[in-house]
Amino acid sequence: MQTGSFDISELKRRMQGATHALQHELGGLRTGRASSSMLEPVQVDAYGTHMPLIQVATISVPEPRLLSVQVWDKSMIKAVEKAIVDSNLGLSPSTEGQVIRLRIPELNEERRKELVKVAHKYAEAARVAVRHVRRDGLDTLKKLEKNHEISEDDQERLAHDVQKVTDATIQEVDQLLAAKEKEILTV
């Protein structure tokens, strides 16, 4: 809905950006299960530049606790191994030809709790981002009302709509967090 120069769909889009960022961050958290997204942040020194691992290899999950990295260029195998070791994911690569296998070790209880704390930190950052978007929207509404571009009633109604969108987005953040927390704590 657009009133004056206020567009609530733009606020929704910005809030969804925060939830997408959260999904991406949570996807990178290592749980006890193998996931190709675990290797997304890995950067490989390839051809004189840093490249994401997915640009030099194919990542697959043949078993629940095993990642398989098929390196396309045989000369890149050592660089990919080094990048995986240097990524601080706690994975030790074993190479068979052009395939690098990564066993995902079991997580102990202490590490699980640490990961849950990290997930909570990510979720809180997403909530803060959503609240910033809400504040921007409310500030815009106040400015429009002050400049007599919208009525006070419209401003209050739109502010209520902004709050509803904010509440829904924060609820989505909480659901993402709860799902990830359950995944982490599942032994």
From Swiss-Prot:
This is Ribosome-recycling factor. GO terms for molecular function: ribosomal large subunit binding. It comes from Rhodopseudomonas palustris (strain BisA53). Responsible for the release of ribosomes from messenger RNA at the termination of protein biosynthesis. May increase the efficiency of translation by recycling ribosomes from one round of translation to another. InterPro entries: Ribosome_recyc_fac, Ribosome_recyc_fac_dom, RRF_sf. CDD domains: RRF. The keyword Cytoplasm applies. NCBIfam families: frr (TIGR00496). One of its GO terms (biological process) is cytoplasmic translational termination. Pfam families: RRF. The keyword Disulfide bond does not apply. It is found in: Cytoplasm. Keywords: Cytoplasm, Protein biosynthesis. Belongs to the RRF family. HAMAP family: RRF. GO terms for cellular component: cytosol.
